[in-house]
Amino acid sequence: MRTLLVDNYDSFTYNLFHYLSRANGREPEVIRNDDPAWRPGLLDAFDNVVLSPGPGTPHRPADFGLCARIAEEGRLPVLGVCLGHQGMALAHGARVGRAPEPRHGRTSAVRHDGTGLFEGLPQPLEVVRYHSLAVTELPPELEATAWSEDGVLMALRHRTLPLWGVQFHPESIGTQDGHRLLANFRDLTERHGRTRHGGRAGHGTLPPPAPARETKATTGTPRRLRVIAKSLPTRWDAEVAFDSLFRTGDHPFWLDSSRPGGELGQLSMMGDASGPLARTAKADVHAGTVTVRADGASSTVESAFLTWLENDLAGLRTEVPELPFAFALGWVGCLGYELKAECDGDAAHRSPDPDAVLVFADRALVLDHRTRTTYLLALVEDDAEAEARAWLAAASATLDAVAGREPEPCPEAPVCTTGPVELRHDRDGYLKLIDVCQQEIAAGETYEVCLTNMAEADTDLTPWAAYRALRRVSPAPFAAFLDFGPMAVLSSSPERFLRIDRHGRMESKPIKGTRPRGATPQEDAALVRALATCEKDRAENLMIVDLVRHDLGRCAEVGSVVADPVFQVETYATVHQLVSTVTARLREDSSPVAAVRAAFPGGSMTGAPKIRTMQIIDRLEGGPRGVYSGAIGYFSLTGAVDLSIVIRTVVLSGGRLRYGVGGAVIALSDPADEFEETAVKAAPLLRLLDTAFPGRERPGKDLDGEPDDGTDAGAPKDLVLPG
């Protein structure tokens, strides 16, 4: 079965791609609704067409594009999903307007006629809806075939042409028997007599879609490197080890599982750019350049940063010893949110800091907290390993010298002068932005907007002193300290963006939904139940899970994308969080960097559909996010990648402190609660500065359930917070 899948710039299209591949036995051809290579005669190469969901309205030609003509002509079987359904109905005389209420990421029990698309499906059918508009009136030639419990038309068919539409999303993980519905569309196509035999449709007629078909970068003769390693029993504190080996070096970094325990807190990595093969790379998205420094000299090349990174990694062939972890040196650092301009986003705002900074680490230390083993790693080229082995010996001696040493006490008096904390958008301004978000949702422009604010202050805070305090008051499995010249990043992130192991197994763990810990076991249990059953939190989480499935699916082997477990309440020292896990397997013809490009920025920091929602965010937030909302982690020489989402993170640069906070705005959101959520998420900063959140009108609990009154309650008793 040859299917043309037209993408209306949605964030669920590749979920349809994988479902259709399973139903048809071959992959559909994907084009966007404004594909310049498209011409109507190309339809003859296909058996049927699926018109994807998408933002906007079918009344706006730019939102529906070439789908309008395909739907109007009805030359071959067409299935419209959500926007595709609305546009197809509009093309044949139906009316499309506002639904009684926006419903995004919410389930409904749909009653149907049991024929056509619904043959053999349960009655009623549980489906997931993502829509603000609906078909409100049908002409005689269109027939309704399904309805929701609130009376909204959920499916239709044309009485004489092979056209079908569904308002709900069969590709959502929350929709019952979505695969079966698409298989029924395949069967309807076969009955219509459109089935063609032979190879994949569209071969030689349309350019391959990107990035799902993006091939690995090719270079000239690869540079051959080798990793040598030394393991030692851990007898030293991680903070002491970093302070002794790397802190005063060039571009020191520490990927710090400051909350060891469990799978997410097993490893910490630290290093710098002091070795003989070390390099640094910085991106400037607006200039379209990458500046690389090596051996004391800098050079600037014109290139998109992720393209440059992929080519650089493709030009290395590294022999790696057997190690019990994926990190074996490579590029370490941060990708800023404005790098979205290379990932279907716009270059709307210029960040005051580099759009990405990575260190090519040729020397590093890895701490395995589970086995209490330390690994020293060094990179050598050709047979020149004497210097590397000398470093291994020197590092071992330094560690031996600090074995058993406790970290220095944090300062007993303020170590900085910090001005008042100011918000980019004060409380009234932020509430107005939330209202605009909900207007956009009601108009069908977006399902969910991850709106953020930026807290800023003048400060002379010392990065190392501040990070030492931060990791005590807000330990996290994905904490990080990056002291990269004029910019320092101090992160206490709990969220994994994307991990890819050396065998191509991918994993993302989006978080949507947070509650503080209770003061008593009874209150704690009640908070867990409330989080697990809250319709708003589940809707937020489901939307991002479906988006992440799409993002990973763009570079994944067909049928390998799995969301399991979902909607799990994970309990940490300070919070309960609603977490889902999405896994997939990287395609043979793709690459780890391509997978990062396809998923960046993380959907939990944008909302959905991602591209349209990022445009809304650009307009409303009125400034750059910088490192906040980007990613921190590594691209290993083994091909492995592990990146966190940059949240709960302090950025110090140019005598200024910045700390981003935000939350997902959906139709069910209460604006006052959304502002309060930003205050709750600022708890690590508030403790660090011993201050209150600007504009907060009511007292609340911070992230560990203690009263958030600007004090340092809950901090270690021997700690006096700087500033």
UniProtKB/Swiss-Prot annotation:
Residues 2-195 form the Glutamine amidotransferase type-1 domain. It catalyses: chorismate + L-glutamine = 4-amino-4-deoxychorismate + L-glutamate. Disruption phenotype: Disruption of the gene abolishes production of candicidin. Its EC number is 2.6.1.85. Keywords: Antibiotic biosynthesis, Glutamine amidotransferase, Multifunctional enzyme, Transferase. Residues 96-117, 192-219, 693-723 are annotated as: Disordered. Pathway: Antibiotic biosynthesis; candicidin biosynthesis. PANTHER family: AMINOBENZOATE/ANTHRANILATE SYNTHASE, AMINODEOXYCHORISMATE SYNTHASE. Involved in candicidin biosynthesis. Catalyzes the biosynthesis of 4-amino-4-deoxychorismate (ADC) from chorismate and glutamine. In the C-terminal section; belongs to the anthranilate synthase component I family. This is Aminodeoxychorismate synthase. It comes from Streptomyces griseus.
